[in-house]
Every structure is written in structure tokens, then in C-alpha cells.
A protein has these predicted regions:
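Alpha-helical transmembrane bundle of multi-pass membrane proteins
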Residues: 1-188
Length: 188
């Protein structure tokens, strides 16, 4: 999310928006982030953490795919704004809130401190790399290719979460520990 907010004015300008409008649109996107973050705080205990991450990542996948397509066909700046707002909404109620709750609940007590440290460090490293790579990706892949790559990242998130991350809503530490430590049959 760090790289997204850092480059919003440039994203909107490259979609054909005037500079003054690009900054206003950046503020509008930040308000969307606030509203959907507050919504997620209310929803996270009702819908479940995994459900929110999957729904949010799915919305991000579609939004990135379509932003890339609109850049590819030189579509309207308004469409890009709406799709960026959709991405931000998906991030806010998925990875922006539910991901942090999962990180705090998923590890057994014995490894919780180390596991959380590694997960949070990984999140910050990805944010840093996004900040560093975004301009290079735009230069070498174009805006369309850049957003298609991000859409691929969202798809990988969906697959990873769907197959490997358990739902932690309503589960005790003992249940989560048992999930990770019990013998499971190998699947073929």
C-alpha cells in the first residue's frame, strides 16, 4: 500500500488527468481507504479473516487487471480512478485489516513472537520493494504491464491464502496450535 499512495498522482496523470485533479483524486482515494478500513474493523469478526483477505485480493486482482487494460487501450482517466478506488477498498478490508489480524492469531504461542516478526518484516520489505520497483516497472513494462504484474501478484495471494492459510475467526490458541502440529496425511 505504501507504493500505491506514493505514486497516486503519477498514476492519475499518466491516465490523462490534469495535475491539480490528480492530487484531488489522491485525497479521494485516501478517503475511500479510511471508510473501508473502518468498515473492515466492524466486519472482520463477522465475516472472518480469510474470507476478507480472499474477497479483498479478488477485488484487487480484477481492479489491477482492468487498470492495465484501460492503460493499454488509452481509456478514460475516470475509469482508472474508479478502479484504483476499487483496489484501495479491496486492500483496506482485505490485506489492510484482516491480514494483520491473521498475523496476530495464526502462530502457536511457542513461535508467535518470531513468526509475527518475520511476517511483519516481509510486509515492510514488499512495501519497500514496491516503492523502489514501481517507477522501473512503469519505465520498462509500461503502465499496462505494471498493473498486469500487480494483478498476477494478487492472484498469487488468492491461491496462497485459499490453500495454505486457515481461518482463525472464533478459534482458540489451542485449536490453532493443534492445526499446525497434528499429523496430516500427505496429499497426492
Amino acid at each position: 500500500m505504501l507504493f500505491r499512495s506514493s505514486f497516486l498522482p503519477e498514476i492519475f496523470r499518466s491516465a490523462g488527468t490534469k495535475t491539480s485533479d490528480a492530487f484531488f483524486q489522491s485525497v479521494l482515494v485516501s478517503l475511500i481507504n479510511l471508510v473501508f478500513t473502518l468498515f473492515a474493523l466492524w466486519l472482520v469478526d463477522k465475516a472472518g479473516r480469510k474470507t476478507l483477505v480472499l474477497a479483498g485480493s479478488s477485488l484487487q486482482f480484477v481492479a489491477f487487471l482492468l487498470v492495465g487494460w484501460f492503460y493499454h487501450i488509452h481509456g478514460s482517466g475516470l475509469a482508472v480512478l474508479i478502479l484504483v478506488m476499487a483496489f484501495v477498498a479491496g486492500h483496506a478490508f482485505g490485506n489492510g485489516v484482516a491480514c494483520w489480524v491473521i498475523i496476530s492469531e495464526i502462530y502457536p504461542t511457542k513461535v508467535r513472537g518470531r513468526g509475527m516478526s518475520i511476517a511483519i518484516t516481509a510486509l515492510w520489505v514488499v512495501g519497500y520493494l514496491g516503492n523502489q520497483l514501481f517507477p522501473l516497472m512503469q519505465k520498462h513494462l509500461g503502465s499496462d504491464g505494471t498493473f498486469w504484474c500487480f494483478s498476477g501478484g494478487a492472484l498469487l495471494t488468492i491461491i496462497f491464502v485459499a490453500w495454505l492459510i486457515p481461518e482463525t475467526k472464533g478459534r482458540s490458541l489451542e485449536e490453532i496450535t493443534k492445526f499446525w502440529t497434528e499429523d496430516k496425511p500427505a496429499t497426492t
